[in-house]
Amino acid sequence: MLENLSTEHRNEKTMNLDEMSIKEVLQSMNEEDRTVALAVEKEIEQIEKVVQTVIKSFEEEGRLIYIGAGTSGRLGILDAVECPPTFGTDDKMVQGYIAGGLKAFTKAVEGAEDREELAEEDLKSIGLNEKDTVIGIAASGRTPYVIGGLKYAQSVGASTASISCNKNAEISKYAKLNVEVETGAEILTGSTRLKAGTAQKLVLNMISTASMIGVGKVYKNLMVDVQSTNEKLVERSKRIIMEATGASYEVAAEYYEKAERNVKAAIVMVLLQCEYGEALEKLKYAKGFVKKAL
């Protein structure tokens, strides 16, 4: 029942929210937000297991698929679309699906989250298989769309995980791994786009970033698979080469172009003083890990 969920409880500290000054409202929000990272910290071990599962999928050329409704679905899509420019992935490697389809990203689609079959249809449309990992996201932990998606994922042998903001969440029954970040009552009762949404974003950041590190998308703490899709990222790419090799801006820029704007290859070329083709071979042999290629 909805009233039993901690995310639906009234926050005792903000009973007079409508009477607070603007500054008091902001201070209350800030105070509550401080608790979110601590709540996430309690779930690190579970998040680690999820990351290990995602890495295994990636190593087997499987995909990471997020499913959710409302804010939860939007956060999954947000994390997914950041992976290609940040980590050089193709747009199929990490995907996000929201109840009601992409139009629901900007406008609520009434009743979509209550239909389990919609998630099954979404996952069937991409040929979900046993190599993939599906992560269901729901602050309440009871969204039918997410439950339907997790059920279907299990039926085809895909790995499954859930992210919710209540303990003993309903969706946890349908996923092998469960991340339950108990964020408690919101300052505005039931508005889970607040602390619960923040917690979900933090967890998704962890999962995608740690998984990409696990498949060689990072060298030291540098995003060496960054895609130079605009002038800012072109400059960042050159700076990454400089940081990784100690080369001057001019040398970094030269090798960046020699490597056909492949940052990883440019780093290997500078440090090993080799040609582009040899750098690519070394990276291929090292499965994309710069450190191993060196």
UniProtKB/Swiss-Prot annotation:
<dbReference type="InterPro" id="IPR040190">
    <property type="entry name" value="MURQ/GCKR"/>
</dbReference>
<dbReference type="GO" id="GO:0046348">
    <property type="term" value="P:amino sugar catabolic process"/>
</dbReference>
<dbReference type="GO" id="GO:0097367">
    <property type="term" value="F:carbohydrate derivative binding"/>
</dbReference>
<comment type="subunit">
    <text>Homodimer.</text>
</comment>
<dbReference type="GO" id="GO:0097173">
    <property type="term" value="P:N-acetylmuramic acid catabolic process"/>
</dbReference>
<keyword id="KW-0119">Carbohydrate metabolism</keyword>
<dbReference type="GO" id="GO:0009254">
    <property type="term" value="P:peptidoglycan turnover"/>
</dbReference>
<feature type="active site">
    <location>
        <position position="113"/>
    </location>
</feature>
<dbReference type="Pfam" id="PF22645">
    <property type="entry name" value="GKRP_SIS_N"/>
</dbReference>
<feature type="active site" description="Proton donor">
    <location>
        <position position="82"/>
    </location>
</feature>
<dbReference type="GO" id="GO:0016835">
    <property type="term" value="F:carbon-oxygen lyase activity"/>
</dbReference>
<comment type="function">
    <text>Specifically catalyzes the cleavage of the D-lactyl ether substituent of MurNAc 6-phosphate, producing GlcNAc 6-phosphate and D-lactate.</text>
</comment>
<dbReference type="InterPro" id="IPR005488">
    <property type="entry name" value="Etherase_MurQ"/>
</dbReference>
<protein>
    <recommendedName>
        <fullName>N-acetylmuramic acid 6-phosphate etherase</fullName>
        <ecNumber>4.2.1.126</ecNumber>
    </recommendedName>
</protein>
<dbReference type="InterPro" id="IPR005486">
    <property type="entry name" value="Glucokinase_regulatory_CS"/>
</dbReference>
<keyword id="KW-0456">Lyase</keyword>
<comment type="similarity">
    <text>Belongs to the GCKR-like family. MurNAc-6-P etherase subfamily.</text>
</comment>
<comment type="pathway">
    <text>Amino-sugar metabolism; N-acetylmuramate degradation.</text>
</comment>
<dbReference type="GO" id="GO:0016803">
    <property type="term" value="F:ether hydrolase activity"/>
</dbReference>
<dbReference type="InterPro" id="IPR046348">
    <property type="entry name" value="SIS_dom_sf"/>
</dbReference>
<feature type="domain" description="SIS">
    <location>
        <begin position="54"/>
        <end position="217"/>
    </location>
</feature>
<dbReference type="InterPro" id="IPR001347">
    <property type="entry name" value="SIS_dom"/>
</dbReference>
